[in-house]
Amino acid sequence: RIFVATFSSNTSRLQQIFTAAERHGRKVALVGRSMLNVFNAANNLGYIQKKPDTLIEISQVDNYPPEQVVIISTGSQGEPMSALTRIAFSNHREIEIQPGDTVIISATPIPGNEKPIYKVINELYRRGAKVYYSALADVHVSGHASQEEIKLVHALVRPKFFIPAHGETRMLYQHA
């Protein structure tokens, strides 16, 4: 089985995972309340393109051979109540890590989250999973626009006013 932990709000990453899973004949299950909520909204609005039989319930995972399953999970930052953390520590009521599972954490730790995510990664290793994360593999692409992408948006939208509102002081100055 392949687990992919990502931000639930990253719908383009969800689409990438569905596309890759279908290309390789795998079913996809979702785990984590926010993952289910965001997926349902994106799917209902037509932002997720998938075959009708690709998505399965997490309770159906054991009905398929491990090489036919991808599980998309919340918890890429090691949040204590996230699905991946609960799965890693055998506190999830529907699924647990099995030796040989592959876990991809597709986000770089946000500064300050290193300790909790490495605690989860250590536990995944203890349970026999193969773990891929930003320090070992090229599995993270920023969800933030690059400087050139921001310039393009400004050129397209041509706002009358613009106020940078997110980031550290140095970032706000650079953005302005």
Task: Tell me what each language-model feature is.
Residues 1-176:
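Acidic/His-rich, metal-assisted hydrolase cores and their charged scaffolds
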